[in-house]
Structure formats: C-alpha cells, structure tokens
C-alpha cells in the first residue's frame, strides 16, 4: 500500500479534464455530501477550506524484475484536492520567479538550460526578423502562454493510493504533505 503524488499534467487527457473540472467537489469535514463548484467559491470565506474529489483509475505500468520487464494493470484511487490558500501560495511563488525572469531578460544574461522550476522557463528567445529571416541578435521576452498554462493547475494537488484507509484519512495525510511542501 502507498500514497504517492500524481502530477495532473502527466495524466491522460480525460483524467486531467476530470481533475480540473469545476463541479462535483466535496468539502473536507462536511458529512452532508454537498457538491461544490470551484467557480462559486469565495476567495476570503473559503480560503482555509479544503475541497476534494476521488475516483478509481486503471493505469498500465511497467514492472521491472530480475526476469525482465512486464506490463501490469494497476487499479488505484486518484484523489484530487483544491485549496484557495494553496492556489495563492503557488501564484506567489511563481510571481517571484517571473520577477527574476524579467531581471534576467533585462540583464541580457544568456538563456541556457531551463529546468522545471527555473525562472528561465518563462523566457522565450526569438532570433528572426518580422519577415522570418534569421537575425544576428536574439531577443528574449517573457512568454505569458507558459505562465497561463501553469496557472490552470494552481491550487490542485493529486495523489494516487492503494490504501484501504477512509477518504478522510488519506486526505488528512495528503494535507499534511502539502503543508510540509509549503514550508
């Protein structure tokens, strides 16, 4: 049994759509079963609340053994959570990275390798004239499409598990993990 983080970006399209969909969210600690829409949440009133939804998924996985690799279907529970507080935290961190990227562009520093959390991931370099001819100098700028693409995942956090624990127990464990990551 395990609980492991699940990047939403790496899920199949229909699962990403389900994870990011606006409706069918439950409120942690609310026993009524009332469903919420994320678009109807209040940034102040619902700031400290923790919303979630869950479903079973089947994923094909490659199991590596001494006798070679083999494919196996793994059935596991996908739990996605959403928190306005976590969304705001992620936006705050990104804003600092964007400000560093702006300074890099302004300094004329060369844009080398871009890592996952490197501010340089927001920088795009263009080395052509308006006519499409190769230019002698490259122009770097902040690519807002990268920012927009990341922003759609703000506030969401997903885990997969095979634990037999209750949803509430798994969500509490997940919440503690996320709080540790914010430190």
Where are the predicted features?
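Anion-binding and metal-coordination hotspots
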Residues: 1-183
């Amino acid at each position: 049994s395990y609980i492991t983080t699940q990047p939403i970006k790496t899920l199949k399209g229909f699962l990403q759509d389900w994870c990011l969909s606006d409706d069918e969210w439950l409120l942690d600690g609310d026993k009524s079963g009332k469903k919420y829409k994320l678009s109807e949440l209040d940034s102040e009133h619902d700031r400290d609340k923790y919303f979630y939804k869950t479903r079973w998924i089947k994923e094909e996985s490659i199991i590596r053994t001494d006798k070679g690799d083999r494919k196996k279907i793994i059935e596991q529970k996908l739990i996605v959570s959403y928190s306005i507080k976590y969304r705001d935290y992620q936006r705050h961190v990104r804003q600092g990275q964007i400000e560093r990227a702006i300074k890099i562009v302004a300094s004329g520093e060369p844009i080398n390798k871009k890592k996952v959390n490197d501010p340089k991931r927001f920088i795009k370099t263009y080395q052509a004239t308006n006519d499409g001819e190769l230019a002698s100098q490259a122009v770097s700028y902040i690519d807002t499409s990268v920012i927009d693409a990341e922003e759609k995942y703000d506030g969401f956090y997903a885990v997969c598990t095979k634990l037999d624990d209750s949803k509430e127990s798994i969500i509490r464990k997940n919440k503690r993990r996320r709080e540790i990551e914010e430190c």
